[in-house]
């Protein structure tokens, strides 16, 4: 995942 975008792992 990209830095700052770990919340997009769904």
UniProtKB/Swiss-Prot annotation:
Keyword Electron transport recorded: no
Main localisation: secreted
GO CC terms of this entry: extracellular region
Subcellular location: Secreted
Tissues of expression: Expressed in the CNS and thoracic perisympathetic organs (tPSO) but not in the ring gland, midgut or abdominal perisympathetic organs (aPSO) (at protein level).
GO BP: any one term: neuropeptide signaling pathway
Family: Belongs to the FARP (FMRFamide related peptide) family.
Protein name stated in the entry: FMRFamide-like neuropeptide SAPGQDFMRF-amide
Organism: Delia radicum
């Amino acid at each position: 995942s990209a830095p700052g975008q770990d919340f997009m792992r769904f």
